[in-house]
Swiss-Prot record:
This is D-aminoacyl-tRNA deacylase. An aminoacyl-tRNA editing enzyme that deacylates mischarged D-aminoacyl-tRNAs. Also deacylates mischarged glycyl-tRNA(Ala), protecting cells against glycine mischarging by AlaRS. Acts via tRNA-based rather than protein-based catalysis; rejects L-amino acids rather than detecting D-amino acids in the active site. By recycling D-aminoacyl-tRNA to D-amino acids and free tRNA molecules, this enzyme counteracts the toxicity associated with the formation of D-aminoacyl-tRNA entities in vivo and helps enforce protein L-homochirality. Keywords: Cytoplasm, Hydrolase, RNA-binding, tRNA-binding. The gene is dtd. GO terms for molecular function: D-tyrosyl-tRNA(Tyr) deacylase activity; Gly-tRNA(Ala) deacylase activity; Ser(Gly)-tRNA(Ala) hydrolase activity; tRNA binding. Its EC number is 3.1.1.96. GO terms for cellular component: cytoplasm. InterPro entries: Daa-tRNA_deacyls_DTD, DTD-like_sf. A Gly-cisPro motif from one monomer fits into the active site of the other monomer to allow specific chiral rejection of L-amino acids.
């Protein structure tokens, strides 16, 4: 599992059927790989919720998303598993098949919500417009394999 976490002042996702937006918080680009398990979902969700990526009164990254009452915008992003080693067109054989990936993506969002953080989402498997106003910028990539952060 790969998740790109961007600290944002505002973020929005739109397609033909939905429009969701958040203010201060995280915009997550969530990739579900062919080897992603529920243990990875839990490990990454916990790590992101506890990540101290917001400044305290002294300007140090000391506060987590719960402490700043931030929100999360979670967007599925299978292209995080692109294989670009051969040719000029990326391959996506390292991504989990869409049906299984959607189940794990929903479980990931449920795991985040279990920490009493407001989570909004894009629509799995559709083309979307994503609008992000980064804060910092602070961008961190979290990866998990076999239930462990790598």
């Amino acid at each position: 599992m790969k998740v790109v976490v961007q600290r944002v002042k505002r973020a929005a996702v739109t397609n033909k059927s939905i429009h969701n937006e958040i203010d201060k918080g995280f915009c997550l680009l969530v990739g579900i790989g062919k080897d992603t398990t529920e243990a990875d979902i839990d490990a990454v969700a916990k790590k992101i919720i506890n990540a101290r990526l917001f400044e305290d009164e002294n300007g140090k990254l000391n506060l987590n998303i719960q402490q700043v009452e931030g929100q999360i915008l979670s967007i599925s992003q299978f292209t995080l598993y692109a294989d670009v080693r051969k040719g000029n067109r990326p391959g996506f054989s390292n991504s989990k098949n869409p049906e299984e990936a959607n189940v794990l993506y929903e479980k990931f969002n449920t795991a985040l919500k279990a920490y009493d953080v407001e989570v909004k989402t894009g629509e799995f498997g559709t083309d979307m417009e994503v609008e992000i106003i980064n804060d910092g910028p602070v961008t961190i990539i979290y990866e998990s394999q076999d239930g462990k952060i790598i």
